[in-house]
Amino acid sequence: MEVYEAICTVLAVREFQSKPVPDNAIHRIIESARLTASSMNRQPWNFIVVNNRDTLIKLGSVVTPGPYTAQAAFAVAVAIDKSSPFGISDASRAIQSMVLTAWSEGIGSNWTGW
């Protein structure tokens, strides 16, 4: 899938199939975020893959809006360095890279927060 096509067709998914996502697809999703440009190459982020069902259920109870998080095969928690002046915008760029990479892999996603 071309980047432009992914941008034009991506959807915010709120219902997930109960099938596992291959580890190599998860790796590509995280790698796309890691390779995203950041202000002064600070890379003020950490990515935490959550694929434990009990943890996903707990996570779904605290994210806004996010009950559907409990249905997902995995989630990625993004932590940023609050001292970075562009941490939020840099992390936002990385998240968008993950969303588009997942979509190009045939994997739906949704961006939530708390």
Regions found by a protein language model. Give the residues of each.
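Short hydrophobic alpha-helices that are characteristic scaffold elements of the AMP-binding
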Residues: 100-104
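Specificity-determining recognition surfaces
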Residues: 1-25
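Glycine/small-residue-rich phosphate/adenosyl-binding loop
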Residues: 24-95
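GST superfamily/GST-like fold recognition
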Residues: 107-114
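Short, structured loop/turn "capping" segments at alpha-beta junctions
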Residues: 70, 105-107
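Short, hydrophobic/aromatic-rich beta-strand segments within well-structured domains
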Residues: 76-78, 99, 111
